[in-house]
């Protein structure tokens, strides 16, 4: 997601991938250590670090993106344009539901099973 959203902050990245901040911090640390991303301080708030892909990161992103696009096309084989649109809308709706539930849990609440 960093290649798709250069300059994203770590907290927003954690929200996007529905993970806790600690897990996101560990992943970002490993990506930085392996020179896939770089962190740059915000010009107005030095506590905020923006994440950017490096050349190495962009190089590995391309085949990953192609694989993802290919897998999506395979998943939608045999779907009409309308069926695909409907499926994407349903998946978007499911994603919103999951994000709301995750936000609830992230705030320390417990789910009622």
Regions found by a protein language model. Name each.
Residues 1-23, 30:
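N-terminal helix-turn-helix DNA-binding core of bacterial DNA-binding proteins
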Residues 1-4, 65, 92:
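Short, locally clustered residues in the helix-turn-helix/winged-helix DNA-binding domain
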Residues 22-23, 75, 108-113:
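Short alpha-helical linear motifs
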Residues 17, 28, 77-80, 103-106:
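Short, charged/polar low-complexity linear motifs in solvent-exposed/disordered segments
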Residues 29-89:
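Charged, amphipathic alpha-helical coiled-coil/dimerization segments
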Residues 81-113:
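C-terminal regulatory/oligomerization modules of transcriptional regulators
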């Amino acid at each position: 997601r960093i290649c798709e959203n250069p300059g994203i902050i770590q907290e927003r990245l954690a929200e996007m991938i529905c993970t806790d901040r600690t897990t996101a911090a560990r992943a970002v640390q490993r990506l930085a250590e392996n020179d896939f991303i770089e962190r740059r301080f915000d010009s107005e708030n030095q506590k905020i670090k923006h994440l950017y892909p490096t050349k190495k990161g962009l190089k590995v992103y391309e085949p990953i993106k192609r694989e993802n696009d290919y897998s999506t096309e395979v998943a939608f084989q045999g779907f009409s344009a309308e069926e695909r649109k409907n499926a994407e809308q349903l998946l978007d709706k499911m994603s919103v539901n999951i994000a709301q539930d995750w936000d609830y849990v992230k705030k320390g609440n417990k789910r009622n099973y």
